[in-house]
């Protein structure tokens, strides 16, 4: 008996789903998705209207981005500048620097 009750409730729910799908396709009910018109009118050459949440999120993420860039540059600058040793100018010769010898005056 309990199996018949479960089967009847299953058939009832399935029938509701079938009817609601048919009504939605016929336009007699169901979910209304839009009013048929444009919700936001386009504005030619004007900035979009931003909400406070959008402004806060954009400032937060841009601040986070610049923090990450500056942090990485400060702590791992060789990733940007390269892994080259800085040359020691005291080891350069006058010839390499283009300085003429003293006895050629």
UniProtKB/Swiss-Prot annotation:
UniProt region (Disordered), positions on chain: 85-105
Pfam family, one: NADH_B2
Transmembrane segments: none
Localization of this protein: Mitochondrion inner membrane
Keyword field: Electron transport, Membrane, Mitochondrion, Mitochondrion inner membrane, Respiratory chain, Transit peptide, Transport
Domain of life: Eukaryota
UniProt topology in membrane: Peripheral membrane protein
GO terms of biological process kind: mitochondrial respiratory chain complex I assembly
Chief location category: mitochondrion
Regions of compositional bias (Acidic residues) in chain numbering: 95-105
GO CC terms: mitochondrial inner membrane; respiratory chain complex I
Subunit-structure text: Complex I is composed of 45 different subunits.
Biological function: Accessory subunit of the mitochondrial membrane respiratory chain NADH dehydrogenase (Complex I), that is believed not to be involved in catalysis. Complex I functions in the transfer of electrons from NADH to the respiratory chain. The immediate electron acceptor for the enzyme is believed to be ubiquinone.
PANTHER family noted in UniProt: NADH DEHYDROGENASE [UBIQUINONE] 1 BETA SUBCOMPLEX SUBUNIT 2, MITOCHONDRIAL, NADH-UBIQUINONE OXIDOREDUCTASE AGGG SUBUNIT
Record's protein name: NADH dehydrogenase [ubiquinone] 1 beta subcomplex subunit 2, mitochondrial
């Amino acid at each position: 008996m309990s199996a018949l009750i479960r089967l009847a409730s299953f058939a009832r729910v399935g029938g509701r789903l079938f009817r609601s799908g048919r009504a939605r396709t016929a336009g007699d009910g169901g979910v209304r998705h839009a009013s048929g018109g444009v919700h936001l009118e386009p504005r030619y050459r004007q900035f979009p209207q931003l909400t406070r949440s959008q402004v806060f999120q954009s400032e937060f993420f841009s601040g986070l981005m610049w923090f990450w860039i500056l942090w990485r540059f400060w702590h791992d600058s060789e990733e940007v500048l390269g892994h080259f040793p800085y040359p020691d100018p005291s080891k350069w010769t006058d010839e390499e620097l283009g300085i003429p010898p003293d006895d050629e005056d």
